[in-house]
Regions:
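Extended repeat-based scaffolds of very large eukaryotic assembly and lipid-transport proteins
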Residues: 1-188, 196-203
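Eukaryotic acidic, Ser/Thr-rich intrinsically disordered low-complexity regions
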Residues: 1-18, 216-257
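A short linear boundary/processing microfeature
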Residues: 75-79, 208, 240
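Short secondary-structure transition/capping segments
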Residues: 167-171, 208, 248
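Extended alpha-solenoid helical-repeat scaffolds
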Residues: 187, 200-209, 213-221, 232-236
Length: 257
């Protein structure tokens, strides 16, 4: 049995499994997951091991609220292209790296971090990831990924990422993924905490780029941004969106009424 099979291919009952999620999430109710941490750290840091196994070890460590996992995420975010596993997982829609989206998923859940006293480091790992939002692809996760407390801690970093992204769009820089939609997703997340700010961020993006996909994602702000800003934003979307967007906006406005 390989080291990977022992650590992530065997459930906590000692049975082989081909579903790594059985192990990743089984750890939340199984203190014995701590016994696997030293081996996972060694696997993650071993250049002789396959990149996919090193990456999944990092995902496991971050999911389990381990210091080594969060520190690895921060290192990866500091120099994305040099990460050993960069481009090992590629998004089908845009044919770009999707490892940071998976790492963001791993960092988002803070239950074990609270238990292990690593919450501050978890937030720093989340900060490092959010700072990549204008340059790396996060699938469609950033709108709903982080809890409100984490979002508050990251608010300045989110604003800076959106600022950089808008400047990039204005300059006509070409990325291989849908940056405007990703920025709108961030604005949508912010709108739960600060409706006016979230709407302002989204409007800055839409004034530069407003594809049907971006507008469709922007609809979430209509119900998330409490107060008149959400309704005003919905009325704006009615003037620029297609039939699908308009129907979704009217539904959202109806719920908010």
């Amino acid at each position: 049995m390989t080291r990977f099979s022992e650590l992530l291919g065997t459930d906590f009952g000692g049975e082989p499994t081909t579903d790594i999620e059985d192990v990743l999430f089984g750890a939340f109710d199984e203190p014995r997951h701590r016994d696997r941490v030293p081996g996972l750290v060694e696997l993650m840091n071993d250049p002789a091991e396959p990149e996919i196994e090193r990456f999944l070890a990092c995902v496991a460590l971050a999911t389990w609220g381990e210091t080594a996992g969060y520190e690895a995420v921060i290192r990866a975010a500091a120099d994305p292209g040099s990460t050993p596993w960069y481009d090992f997982s590629v998004d089908r829609k845009f044919s770009v790296d999707s490892t940071f989206a998976q790492l963001a998923d791993a960092v988002a859940d803070g239950d074990l971090a609270q238990e292990k006293g690593t919450e501050e480091l978890r937030v720093e790992a989340a900060r490092a990831l959010v700072r990549l939002a204008d340059s790396q692809y996060f699938e469609d996760k950033l709108g709903e990924l982080f809890d409100n407390a984490t979002l508050r801690a990251l608010l300045d970093d989110i604003k800076e990422a959106v600022d950089r992204g808008v400047r990039s769009l204005v300059a006509g820089e070409q990325l291989r993924f849908d940056l405007p939609t990703q920025l709108v997703d961030l604005a949508s997340a912010v709108s739960v905490l600060d409706g006016p700010l979230g709407v302002e961020m989204a409007m800055r993006v839409l004034k530069v780029s407003s594809s049907p996909r971006t507008l469709n994602h922007a609809v979430a702000l209509v119900s998330r941004a409490q107060g008149p800003e959400g309704r005003q934003f919905g009325e704006y979307l009615l003037t620029v969106g297609d039939e699908k967007v308009s129907a979704e906006v009217r539904e959202a406005l109806g719920r908010a009424a």
